[in-house]
Every structure is written in C-alpha cells, then in structure tokens.
Amino acid sequence: QPDFDARSMKSSILYQMGKLEESEKLTQRCLYEEIRNAGLSLVSLAKIAGEESEYEKAFRFLDAAQELETLFEESRLGGVNVMVSQMKLGILVKQGKKDQALSELKHLVMGYLNIVQGRKTETPIYFDKLEWNESTSPKRGYLLENLLWLLETEDVYAELRAEDVYREMVEKIQKELEKSR
C-alpha cells in the first residue's frame, strides 16, 4: 500500500493541465482530511498516555491537537476541540484538580453549545473552495444528548456532580436540548 494519498498526485496533474479550480478543491479536501486525521491521532495518543497515567504526556498531545485546530481555524467545523476539552476534564478530575476541572467543564459545555447553536464564522482560507452541508456536520441534538449522558453517567465526573458549576452547565445543556426539540 503506498504511503501517500494518490489524490495529491491527481491534484498536481490537474494543476499542470491548467485545471486550477479543480486542483485547488481537491488539495483543500486532502488538507482538511489530513488535519482532521492528525488531530484525531493526537487525541488517540493522548488517550493511551492517559490510560498509562502519563498525564503530562497526554496534555502535550491534547495541546498539540488544539494548536493544530487553532492554526487552521478548523474549530468552526466542530473539529477536535470539544474532544480535547472532554479528555482534559477527565484527566484533571483523575488528578484531583477540581477547580481546574470545573473551569474545563465550562469550556467544554460552551464549545458544545457553540457547535449546536451553529455560530457562523468566516470560512478559513484553507478551505474556502469546499462545500459544507448537513452531512458534513454532526447532528446537533445528538451532540448535546451525548454530552449530557456522559456527564451524568461516567464515574470520572461523579465528584463534580455536587458542585454548583456542574449543575449550571447541566441546566444549560438541558435548556438547549429543549429548544432543539
């Protein structure tokens, strides 16, 4: 199996043929997928490091995933930032850093709400030739239901449930869910 994406070669050929728009669209699609995959790989490496109780290493992977997303302005598309925030929250709880965990919980819930509320931003120049539609974005109600389920059922969040901040964030999620029904 080749260690490169054949679409990159096709894009180069399209460019040489003078089909610039087609080449640009294909190159942007490849870039988007590579960035997304790199972010997901960093998150996976962070999960492994977290399971091995190598929390500093996990945070470095998660920070790199966020930096990648920030660099390419991909967060408007719902990329990995919420996954990173969720993982950081879990690690902070395991480390007994309750105040930092509650702060991360706020960040996590606001990230989900931004996605669900569909806050529009300008399309990043890296992806301005790509078309976005409902099939390329996750179902909004499902995201909130999933987050609420995780917060209410995962053992790692148990010690946060008695906190006011936790209850406020759960209420925000529930209110947004009611609006979406």
Give the ranges of each region predicted by the language model:
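Solenoidal tandem-repeat scaffolds enriched in leucines and small polar residues
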Residues: 1-42
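Alpha-helical protein-protein interaction modules
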Residues: 35, 39-181
